[in-house]
């Protein structure tokens, strides 16, 4: 399953999100992390000139296991429910909502380690808060605990403010840091369906 939608929120909602989910919002507690994942062994990527390496990222945890940790939970939950209603998806439980900020890098043809957010069946809604050139890379392969697969790129998605992608949470994916814009800001929502 993969859905791309850049026409499910009003312009007012898109602007509210872009003004709320920033480093400048003093109501949000941001944490600087050394990497985007905790993966130690990177999967190989076939037929690609992409180099896999880490960059630091700034993260805000908005909710975890249905526990609301900040106002960003409400914004993320609202985005998810609007998207789900439009696409006929029944939400059972929100597992996690977090905001990620990746800063500009000089690295070329570089992506972060391919990963899955959780190793249980779930869906991911990735909402792009701002326009950026830090693409998301989707792979054909799914997570399997017994092996680290060789990956093939399925598609890349350029971040566009107000757009979101929905995909099977067991599908390997990667982020990348922007090279031309200052920041790439996303809301990452992991959830279960009925």
Set out the residue ranges of the language-model regions.
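Non-heme Fe(II)/2-oxoglutarate
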Residues: 1-90
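Catalytic core of non-heme Fe(II) oxygenases with the double-stranded beta-helix
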Residues: 69-77, 81-187, 192-194
């Amino acid at each position: 399953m993969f859905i791309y939608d850049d026409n499910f929120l009003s312009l007012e909602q898109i602007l509210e999100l872009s003004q709320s989910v920033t480093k400048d919002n003093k109501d949000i507690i941001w944490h600087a992390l050394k990497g985007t994942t905790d993966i130690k062994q990177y999967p190989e990527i076939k037929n690609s000139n992409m180099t896999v390496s880490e960059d630091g990222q700034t993260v805000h945890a908005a909710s975890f296991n249905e526990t609301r940790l900040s106002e960003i939970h409400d914004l993320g939950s609202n985005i998810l429910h609007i998207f789900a209603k439009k696409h006929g998806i029944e939400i059972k439980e929100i597992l996690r909502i977090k905001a990620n900020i990746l800063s500009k890098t000089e690295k070329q043809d570089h992506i972060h380690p391919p990963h899955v957010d959780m190793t249980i069946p779930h869906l991911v809604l990735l909402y792009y808060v701002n326009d950026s050139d830090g693409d998301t890379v989707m792979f054909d392969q799914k997570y399997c605990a017994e092996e680290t697969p060789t990956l093939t790129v399925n598609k890349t998605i350029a971040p566009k403010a107000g757009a979101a992608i929905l995909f099977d949470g067991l599908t390997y994916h990667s982020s990348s840091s922007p090279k031309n814009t200052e920041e790439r800001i996303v809301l990452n929502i992991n959830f279960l369906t009925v």
